[in-house]
Every structure is written in C-alpha cells, then in structure tokens.
C-alpha cells in the first residue's frame, strides 16, 4: 500500500463504530503532512462525529436508567393519596423562588449595586434593570419583610418556651439524682418460699411478620423467674405468612414441652393492628384469673428477674396502675443513625419519663416493657383502635381515671433500634401523627374530667401542645423555611444566638444522659433539624386527620440481639426437625430442613474464607423528595449568604443543606434489602 494511501474498513455498512483509518505515520513524511484530500478529511470528521454521538447516546441512556431507577424508589413508603405531596409542592415553590432571587442577587452583586440601600435618589438610578431591582427592594422592605419578621418572632418565642421546658426537665432530673429519689418497696410483698404469694401475671407478646426476632422474645419470656403455675404467656401472632405461623407455633410447642405455661393465638380477622390484637387477647375467659398483664414487643428480651423487680411495687399501692421499665438497645453503636437515635431515647427515658414519673405520677406508656394492673385497663376502657398510639391512649385515659404510674430507670429491657432511615422515618411518622389524633379525641374528656386543674393544664399545654405540636412546628418552620428565606430578606435576618448558641446548648442538655455521644453533638443537631420535616408532616396529618395518620407499619427488625454462632443455630434447628416427624408437621419439617441447609451452606462458605461467595440480597437506596428539596433550598440560601459574607449563617446553612442531602439520598443508616 502506498504511504499516502488511506484504507477505510467497516464491519457493517450502516455502522461506523469499527471504522479505521490506516495510513503511514505522518511524522515520517513531514513534507506530506498537508497533503490531505477532501475525502480523507470527510471520513475523519465522520468518525469524530460518530464517536461524539455514541458518547452522547451512552450518557442519555445512563441518565434514563438512573431516572427510571430513582423513580421506582422515590417515596415508595408514602401513600399516593397522602397530603405529603402538598408539602413537596410547597418546598418546590420555595426552592424556585429562592433560585430566582439568588440569580437576581448574583447579577446585582457583580453589577456592584448597593444591596442594602433602598431609599436611593431616583436620579442615581440608571437603566430599566437597575430601576426594577430597586423597586423590588422597596416592595420587599415594605410588604414581605414585616410578615417574615412577625413569623420569625412568633417561632422564636415558641423556641424559647420549648428550650425553657427542656431546661426545667434537666433540672428536675438533676434534683432526682442529687436527692437519690427513686421508687422503693415499702414492705416485703412476696414470700419467696411460698409460690402462692406470687400474684397471677399474664405475659403478652404481640407480633406481626417478625421472623427475625420471634425466637428471642418467646425464649426470654419463657425464662422469666416466676412460678410456672402463676404465669401465662400469650404469643399473639398476627402474621399473614402461613410458613412463619408454623415456625412460631413450633417455637411455642418447644417451650410448652419444657413445662412453660404458654399458648399460641392467631386472629382470623386481623383488624385494629396492635391495639386490636391486644384487645382480642383480653377477651379470653381465663384472663379474669390474672391480676397483672405485662407486654413485650417481639424484639424485647427481658432479664429473668424482670417480674421480681416490677410486680412487687403494686403491693400495698392500690392506686398504682402501671410500672414502666427502661429500654436499652443492643445495636446502638451499629451506625450513625442508631447512635443519634440512642441520644434521643436516652434523654426520653432518663429525663422525661423519670421526671414525670417522680413529680407527676404520670407519663406516656411506651407500649412495651411495662406491667399493667388489669383492673386499671378495664376501668379505663381497655385497648382502643381509634389511633396508632394505643399505648399513649390508654395511659391518658388511665390518668384521667386517677391511676398513678411508676417509672423504674434501673430496670432495663433490651430491644432494637431501626437501622435504616426508611424504617426510622415510618416509625417517627407514627409516633408524631398519633398524639395529634389522640389530642383531638381526648380534649373534651380532659376538660370534663375530675382531675385537678394543674393536671389538666399539664396534659393540654405540656404533654400535648408543647412537646407534641409546638416542637415539630417551630423546628421545621424556623430552621428549614424562615432561616433560608431571611438570606434573601436581610431586614428579617435571624440573630446568631437563635441559629447557633441556644441550639447547641439544648443539644448539650440532650446529650448529658449519654455522655459517650458527645462527639456526635454537631451531627445530632443537624439530624434533628433534618427529621423536623417528617415530624412536622406527621403532626399536620394527625391534627387534620389526613389518610397517612391512620397508617400502621411494623418497624423492620434485624434480629441482632439473637445473633449467635451459626453452627449452634443449625444444630438447634436440626434437633427441632428430628423431633417433629408427625404427619401433620411434614410441611414444617421441610421448611426447617431448607432453613438448616441454608444456614449450613452459609457456615461452610464463611469457613472457606470467601472461596465461595454467598448470594447477597441486593440493597437499594431510597430517594426522599422532600428532604432533597429542602437540601437544595438550604444550599441555595447558603450561596446567597456567601455573597453577603454572613459567616456563621453560611456555615450553618451549608452543613444543614448537606445533612438534608445525605438523608435525601438515603446515605445514612443501612440500606433496604
């Protein structure tokens, strides 16, 4: 082939992806570098154009796939008919307005217009654009700024009231510690030598499709140190999986063979969620033989001495209706999300529950790890299905009937924290929408009740309004909406003590019950503001009876508190399989064999040091639209603050925006399998 010839090869006549230009090295013929024919140049341009089109096509295809994947995972946890869409539209509107305002301010900044001077003489204004900008400044100062200032002052007052309440609670806790105040037994209530002196106790374990944890809760309840003839365990299974029902039945039968007084109960008509399950169980004829009832959720594992530390407090105290124990968490150090949850719940139990129990003899029942006097339940109307917070409902009604509560801070029951943000968000939505439902329903009863005026005031203003309504309202409105808007309205700028000093002080108070969490002070402050959108949305849905307020979603469990050696677990499962050879349990035996084989394979794979890779479930990231919208709103406001050199305002908005971004992309906690 001649040195200056060009050969064009194509695998397919309609595809130029394999087109090649074969020619000699131009550097060998410096005198012929410029002798390129028009045909060669055309082929060269065609090749470059094809490569560019291929690259763009690949990018478009990748973007489409990512959008389709994100659309599939966006807010799958929300009801399509819920009012959350209205909140999202509001956030989008604020974001669009802030972007437009930022664009205007950027132009004004580089044009070197005076951003603060409003009353500028008309003869100094040059051009229609600058005149329009000055007109906007005047309109903003006269009409928009006063409204934002009034709203910010109102939220600031609420913020200070709530901060004062938090400070008073901490002082009350300090007084309890200083004076060593704690519930004490006035007399020897139980003769340990005489089993007949032990009162009759009913144990209830409600569960629904909780495969990961049913064994540990049933096992822990079956090992409670109490005379076998003075205790009955009800396993209240609302699972809709027939295979799981068989497994739970088998676990119950295993403990029954060991002499434990335990029964399995499954409802054919599963209505009312947990409240309906408990209500149905209390209608059994044998319940009238029992004096107390203890409730444990499926992931709770009490110590054997739980009943001996709680039930004796009822002796000689006929007005006592509830004894509540503290929660402890087996997975509190699992990830950042569980660490931040631990801070909140440590404050709740160490401070809120303890102070209210000592000074008021009233607090919200936590739904589990508590002992009720059955008479108190019956006189208060029993379990009602009208809200998603049946525990708080029965506690309020019992308080209105004059029953007293005791909280035991030194009696702990181990449980799990949600490890994924999706599970935590659903839990928090239920915990914050239910109280507002309950407040609407209970307000007439509170007003008409015969309790003292100060107890009524505590219920209405502190228990419901301040801690359940005002807290999520001001935290979302002040820090997520007003603060970023004030960056575009300098007349309404918030002082530093509101956005920095007081929040840090309150966060320090929250961390005091868990001092090991001090390094997470800043992440905790940012995350609490991030969760305000979920709590605010839940509060609104509960207050105005939106559809999402009636949703009950069982919090996903991982069973970490029951993890043990896989070989021991496989051996236990194989023994169960051999023991159940009856014809009626053939299906169960097959299921046990399959699970044993799977566990055995997993053990072998681990023992081979990774030579055989186990097939893992695919984990996906959810995309939370409202959190992402607020992230971009705060980052836009941070950019505006940067132009004005606001310092701490900029850093707060920047890190708060990044916090919303991390949560919106589901980068905190475990992903969903």
UniProtKB/Swiss-Prot annotation:
The active site is at 238, 391. GO terms for biological process: cell wall organization; plant organ development; pollen tube development. The chain crosses the membrane at residues 90-110, 144-164, 469-489, 494-514, 623-643, 648-668. It is a multi-pass membrane protein. One of its GO terms (molecular function) is glycosyltransferase activity. It comes from the Eukaryota. GO terms for cellular component: endosome; Golgi apparatus; Golgi membrane; Golgi trans cisterna; trans-Golgi network. Its EC number is 2.4.1.-. Disulfide bonds: none annotated. It holds the Pfam family Glyco_trans_2_3. Disruption phenotype: Normal xyloglucan (XyG) levels. Plants missing several xyloglucan synthases (e.g. CSLC4, CSLC5, CSLC6, CSLC8 and CSLC12) have no detectable XyG levels and several associated phenotypes including reduced stems height and leaves area, as well as shorter root hairs and reduced pollen tube formation ability. Keywords: Cell wall biogenesis/degradation, Glycosyltransferase, Golgi apparatus, Membrane, Phosphoprotein, Transferase, Transmembrane, Transmembrane helix. It is an enzyme of class 2 (transferase). Expressed in seedlings, roots, leaves, stems, flowers and seeds. The modification Phosphoserine is found at residue 581. It is found in: Golgi apparatus membrane. Substrate binds at residues 297, 299. Its main location: Golgi. Belongs to the glycosyltransferase 2 family. Plant cellulose synthase-like C subfamily. Beta-1,4-glucan synthase rather involved in the synthesis of the xyloglucan backbone than cellulose. Seems to work simultaneously with xyloglucan 6-xylosyltransferase. Xyloglucan is a noncellulosic polysaccharides of plant cell wall and consists of a glucan backbone substituted by xylose, galactose and fucose. Associates with other xyloglucan-synthesizing enzymes to form multiprotein complexes for xyloglucan synthesis in the Golgi. PANTHER family: GLUCOMANNAN 4-BETA-MANNOSYLTRANSFERASE 9, XYLOGLUCAN GLYCOSYLTRANSFERASE 4. Homodimer. Interacts with XXT5. Interacts with FUT1, MUR3 and XLT2. This is Xyloglucan glycosyltransferase 4. It comes from Arabidopsis thaliana (Mouse-ear cress).
């Amino acid at each position: 082939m001649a040195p200056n010839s060009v050969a064009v090869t194509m695998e397919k006549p309609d595809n130029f992806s394999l087109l090649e230009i074969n020619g000699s090295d131009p550097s060998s013929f410096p005198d012929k570098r410029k002798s390129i024919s028009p045909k060669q140049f055309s082929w060269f341009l065609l090749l470059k154009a094809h490569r560019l089109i291929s690259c763009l096509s690949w990018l478009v295809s990748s973007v489409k796939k990512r959008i389709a994947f994100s659309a599939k995972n966006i807010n799958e946890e929300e009801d399509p008919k819920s009012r959350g869409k209205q909140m999202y539209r509001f956030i989008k509107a604020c974001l669009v307005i802030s972007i437009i305002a930022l664009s205007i301010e950027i132009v004004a900044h580089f044009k070197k217009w005076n951003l603060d001077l409003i009353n500028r003489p008309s003869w100094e204004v040059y051009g229609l654009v600058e005149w329009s900008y000055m007109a906007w400044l005047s309109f903003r100062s006269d009409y928009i700024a006063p409204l934002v200032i009034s709203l910010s002052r109102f939220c600031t007052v609420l913020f200070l009231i709530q901060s004062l309440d938090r400070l008073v609670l901490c002082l009350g806790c300090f007084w309890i510690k200083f004076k060593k105040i704690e519930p004490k037994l006035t007399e020897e209530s139980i003769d340990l030598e005489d089993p007949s002196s032990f009162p009759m106790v009913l144990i209830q374990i409600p569960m629904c499709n909780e495969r990961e944890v049913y064994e540990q809760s049933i096992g822990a309840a079956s090992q409670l140190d109490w005379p076998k003839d003075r205790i009955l365990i009800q396993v209240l299974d609302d699972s809709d999986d027939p295979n799981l029902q068989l497994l739970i039945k088998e676990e119950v039968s295993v403990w029954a063979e060991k002499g434990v007084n335990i029964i399995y109960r499954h409802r054919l008509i599963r209505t009312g969620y947990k409240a309906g399950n408990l209500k149905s169980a209390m209608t059994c004829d044998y319940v009238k033989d029992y004096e107390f009832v203890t409730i444990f959720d499926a992931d709770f594992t009490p110590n054997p001495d739980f009943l001996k530390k709680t039930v004796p407090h009822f002796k000689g105290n006929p007005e006592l209706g509830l004894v509540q124990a503290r929660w402890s968490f087996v997975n509190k150090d699992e990830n950042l999300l569980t660490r931040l949850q631990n801070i909140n719940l440590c404050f709740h139990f160490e401070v809120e529950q303890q102070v209210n129990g000592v000074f008021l003899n009233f607090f919200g029942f936590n739904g589990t790890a508590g002992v009720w006097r059955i008479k108190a339940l019956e006189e208060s109307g029993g379990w009602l299905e009208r809200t998603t917070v049946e525990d708080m409902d029965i506690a309020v009604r019992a308080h209105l009937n004059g029953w007293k509560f005791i909280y035991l801070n030194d009696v702990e029951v181990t449980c799990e924290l949600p490890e994924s943000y999706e599970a935590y968000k659903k839990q928090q939505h239920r915990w914050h929408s239910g109280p507002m439902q309950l407040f609407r329903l209970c307000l007439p009863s509170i007003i008409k009740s015969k309790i003292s005026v100060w107890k009524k005031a505590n219920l209405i203003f502190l228990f419901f309004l301040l801690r359940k309504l005002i807290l999520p309202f001001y935290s979302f409105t002040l820090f997520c909406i007003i603060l970023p808007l004030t960056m575009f309205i300098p007349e309404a700028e918030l002082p530093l003590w509101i956005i920095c000093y007081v929040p840090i002080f309150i966060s320090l108070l929250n961390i005091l019950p868990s001092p090991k969490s001090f390094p997470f002070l800043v992440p905790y402050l940012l995350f609490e503001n991030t969760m305000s959108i979920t709590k605010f949305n839940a509060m609104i849905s509960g207050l105005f009876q939106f559809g999402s307020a009636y949703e009950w979603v069982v919090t996903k469990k991982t069973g970490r508190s029951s993890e043990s050696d896989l070989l021991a677990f496989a051996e236990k499962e194989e023994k169960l399989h051999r023991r159940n050879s009856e014809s009626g349990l053939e299906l169960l035996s097959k299921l046990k064999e399959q699970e044993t084989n799977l566990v055995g394979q997993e053990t072998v794979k681990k023992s081979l040091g990774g030579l055989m890779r186990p097939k893992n479930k695919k984990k996906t990231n959810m995309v939370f639209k409202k959190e992402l919208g607020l992230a971009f709103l705060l980052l836009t406001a941070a950019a505006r603050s940067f132009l004005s050199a606001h310092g701490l305002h900029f850093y707060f908005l920047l890190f708060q925006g990044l916090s919303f971004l991390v949560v919106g992309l589901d980068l905190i906690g475990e992903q969903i399998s």
